[in-house]
UniProtKB/Swiss-Prot annotation:
The keyword Cytoplasm applies. InterPro entries: SmpB, SsrA-bd_prot, SsrA-bd_prot_CS. Pfam families: SmpB. It comes from Shewanella frigidimarina (strain NCIMB 400). Signal peptide: none annotated. This is SsrA-binding protein.
Length: 162
């Protein structure tokens, strides 16, 4: 008998680790993606890179640019596979208007944080609304992260000695 996968076993497809280092994320939004067939197949194989990706709003629609989806070798020959094709994000009009206002007036940036499967069949993108960090902010975050690691190491050593 075939064993079923749990719902959370492979829900995550890709994460943008640079986004949390480069930006201070204040809000997160879930959006759908308008994809082609070969892109879905490549995503199922895990050939996605979100590192140089960003979201922009143009004429009342949201688009994700810079997301690299590598085509499979077995992709169809009659379809032109562009790995860095701009993908349309599926958001409600009210969400797009709210985000556009924040971007234009308050200097926020939209950055994709992660890509994951919703209900096993739909690809969703988690978009972070944030502001860019300065160099000193990045250094503080690095020091804080290193301090947490060092503190955990010391605590573990104390438990072993006790």
């Amino acid at each position: 008998m075939v064993k079923k996968k749990s719902a959370n076993a492979s829900a995550s497809i890709a994460r943008n680790k640079r986004a949390t280092f480069e930006y201070r994320i204040e809000d997160k939004i879930e959006a759908g993606l308008q994809l082609m067939g070969w892109e879905v197949k490549s995503i199922r194989m895990g050939k996605v890179n979100l590192s140089d990706c960003y979201v922009y709003i143009k004429e009342g629609e949201a688009f994700m640019h810079g997301c690299t989806i590598q085509p499979l070798n077995t992709a169809s020959t009659h379809v032109i596979c562009d790995p860095i094709r701009t993908k349309k994000l599926l958001l409600k009009r009210s969400e797009i208007d709210k985000l556009a206002g924040l971007i234009e007036r308050q200097g926020y940036t939209l950055v994709p944080l992660s890509m994951y499967w919703r209900k096993g069949a739909w690809v969703k993108v988690e978009i972070g609304l944030g502001k860019g960090k300065k160099d000193h902010d990045k250094r503080e975050d690095t020091k804080e992260r290193e301090w947490k690691i060092e503190k955990a190491r010391v605590m573990k050593k104390d438990k072993e000695n006790a």
